[in-house]
């Protein structure tokens, strides 16, 4: 697999979970002998929802809720078959979305 690259994108609402997952992936890849670039923090996506507090009137009384999506990018350069096998067996939390390209 010389000259190839694996790109892993992580998404999560909890920054501690995504950082722990990224750390676990980097440790696994370094142990198998491949080169790692990252984790690179990508811009955090922030969604703000405005809701009227009262069910019928009092439009001036509103409440704001926000949802932050944290993202990280990890590039694995020159992966070996051992690296790919170790990545398939790694156990990550369900709250972290992993996209491998």
From Swiss-Prot:
InterPro entries: Ribosomal_uS10, Ribosomal_uS10_CS, Ribosomal_uS10_dom, Ribosomal_uS10_dom_sf. PROSITE patterns: RIBOSOMAL_S10 (PS00361). GO terms for biological process: translation. The keyword Metal-binding does not apply. GO terms for cellular component: ribonucleoprotein complex; ribosome. One of its GO terms (molecular function) is tRNA binding. Keywords: Ribonucleoprotein, Ribosomal protein. Pfam families: Ribosomal_S10. Coiled coil: none annotated. It comes from the Bacteria. Part of the 30S ribosomal subunit. HAMAP family: Ribosomal_uS10. Involved in the binding of tRNA to the ribosomes. Belongs to the universal ribosomal protein uS10 family. This is Small ribosomal subunit protein uS10. It comes from Mycobacterium leprae (strain TN). The gene is rpsJ.
